Amino acid sequence: LLSLARRNSAAALSACRRCGVRSLMLTAWGDNGAECSPFAVLPVIAQYSDACYGGFGEACAAPFAVWAGDLNSFFALELPNRLTEEPMWRQTNCSGKYFLYNDPLAGVFDSNVPENARAVARRNGEAIAAARGKVKKEYGYLFDTLASLCGVLELKTDFGVRAKEAYDRGDKPALAALAEECGEIVDLVKHTGLTY
């Protein structure tokens, strides 16, 4: 998550400065190399850049605004991985990823579905869409993709739970509605651009 990377980087930069380290290498890791745009970590790169010029990473918002847009808006990019209303320090997983790839009929992650996941995913998608207007247009695709992902997560995260409950009740109309929702989920996944 971006906020954790910035917090950890602040500690690393402080330690480097305190210990006299003058050269370091910053890396960005993406699962399978293509699951995350390298531009999603621009705020962390800006933090290191500010440190190179003698700052502590806090003064990078103004120069960042010139070439990328509002620095704080980039933190909306971590919202698909925040599907609960828990404080950020309690959320260090990539729930957006495992709910996207989860087979909702297998029930593997059903016990991990947050109670308000649908409402939180909807709000997150709206927040990401709003943040998009505060960044340079060349980075808009980051926000469009993740807002679309939130649309998928809104329907898919608790799909297995809802299907199991409807099945256990013998609620055929609810199951028929869920079958139709499957098509909507597939269409949303295609719209995200996250499939090959």
Where are these regions (language model features)?
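Substrate-binding groove of N-acetylhexosamine-processing glycoside hydrolases
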Residues: L1-Y196
